[in-house]
Swiss-Prot record:
Gene3D superfamilies named among the record's database cross-references: 3.60.21.10
Organism: Escherichia coli O17:K52:H18 (strain UMN026 / ExPEC)
Membrane disposition: Peripheral membrane protein
Designated name of the protein: UDP-2,3-diacylglucosamine hydrolase
Gene coding for it: lpxH
PANTHER family (alphabetical): UDP-2,3-DIACYLGLUCOSAMINE HYDROLASE, UDP-2,3-DIACYLGLUCOSAMINE HYDROLASE-RELATED
Amino acid sequence: MATLFIADLHLCAEEPAITAGFLRFLAGEARKADALYILGDLFEAWIGDDDPNPLHRQMAAAIKAVSDSGVPCYFIHGNRDFLLGKRFARESGMTLLPEEKVLELYGRRVLIMHGDTLCTDDAGYQAFRAKVHKPWLQTLFLALPLFVRKRIAARMRANSKEANSSKSLAIMDVNQNAVVSAMEKHQVQWLIHGHTHRPAVHELIANQQPAFRVVLGAWHTEGSMVKVTADDVELIHFPF
């Protein structure tokens, strides 16, 4: 058996091939797992659990079917869907996890997270993140009419795209000191995260021992998952 991790699907109506690929994954590989962990940015945007978007209802039903089949499903918020709440989690049968979670997997201690908090060199993004994660601001935003939230979200995505176009790739990647600090804080030798869209397995030193950082890929033209078993930790890419 295996535990599966995915992230950065960025599901939206404009990318039906990704949605179809995810549905096939849920109906196939996910049903064989010990557990499924979604490490953020499942959706391209999330403006509230009350959004009647048909795609959201479709995904809730598909994930719920996996959960009902006996495979526990877990979710860590990403920078795109940090407002996903308890209502959608209940409808989809997912358990919401904190932004950093340590798992005991087949004899390994593994830290999982979305990964945006590791990109500490991007001071502008971190300041924005701190602002939009303020509970009072989230409460205020979610109280706005749905059409207003949609306009705000569209403007924020456009601003983010424009800002990122002028940033260096290095600034938008993780900071190595932040990585080591997180792994040493939690006393782990394994870290699995997404966010950067740069799939790879990195070797480093943490806790004065060899350690590994496994980065999930985004679902653009193919699927990406990390498969953890008693024998191995594999980063796997597969066609939709």
